[in-house]
């Protein structure tokens, strides 16, 4: 099944540096995957 990935949800506020880091990591992975699968 081809499933459209959606970008990670951005928290309204980042309470901890780790939250921001985790979000950026997921965002990075999302764009890496999206950039690779161009048809």
Curated annotation (Swiss-Prot):
Q: Which GO terms describe its cellular component?
A: extracellular region
UniProt-listed PROSITE patterns: PANCREATIC_HORMONE_1 (PS00265), PANCREATIC_HORMONE_2 (PS50276)
Listed A to Z, the keywords are: Amidation, Neuropeptide, Secreted
Read off the SMART domains from this record.
PAH
**What is known about the tissue distribution of this protein?**
Neuronal somata and fibers.
Give the family from UniProt. Belongs to the NPY family.
- Name the UniProt record assigns to this protein: Neuropeptide F
Q: Which organism is it from?
A: Cornu aspersum (Brown garden snail)
């Amino acid at each position: 099944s081809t499933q459209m990935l959606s970008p990670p949800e951005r928290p309204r506020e980042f309470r901890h540096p780790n939250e921001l880091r985790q979000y950026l990591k997921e965002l990075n992975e999302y764009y890496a995957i999206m950039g690779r699968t161009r048809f």
